[in-house]
Amino acid sequence: ALALTRQAQEIIRPDLKIIIMSATIDASAICEALQAPLIESEGRMFPVETIYSETDIARYDIYKEVAATILKAADKHEGDILAFLPGQSEILKCKEILDASLSRAAASSSASASLSAASSSAAELSVPQVYPLYGNLPPEKQRLAIAPSKEGERKIVLATPIAETSLTIEGVRIVVDSGLCRKLVYDARTGLSHLETVTISKDMATQRKGRAGRVAEGICYRLWTQTSEHLMED
């Protein structure tokens, strides 16, 4: 897209102004290549506490650990929760666990509370709503995931890396990071490309952590050890 825009500028529209915006791009390299000035806009960031896992989690179990961490965090802290998983499959499996667990918790709460309509309503409001968020999701369901929570409501968003920089989710104060993503890998032997689950870079981890500090002080649960973090690519 940038190459075509530059070509249009050179051939058709020499007066065309080009603005390149990104939260993750290597700005110095782009500025050098295009001979363009750099303008930085830094939003306000609140402190985010980082909590590491004591052990590394097996990839095939990552959705279970994400679900367990979300439930633990929801009991200990306030605010909406954003969890990063590598793909749609893990998101749907994690959502299934959370829906079942939260339904049991709601039923238990209702049974021990008064049977009055007011008490029942309060019990319903206390149960977080779980929303998936990935590229193939219909637009109307994506809007539900990113819409601000109403007063008295709380939500849990299970997302792919689409929520790192492309979308803003207001109200998030807790991030649960699986440390994984899907990456398109080329196989020279077959001449084909395929999606592979890989460990994220330190930059991606920083982007994800920052989502918890947009509106207030937050917490980021990283499902890997500090030792493993030293081995991650920059």
What are these regions (language model features)?
Residues 2-234:
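P-loop NTPase motor module signature
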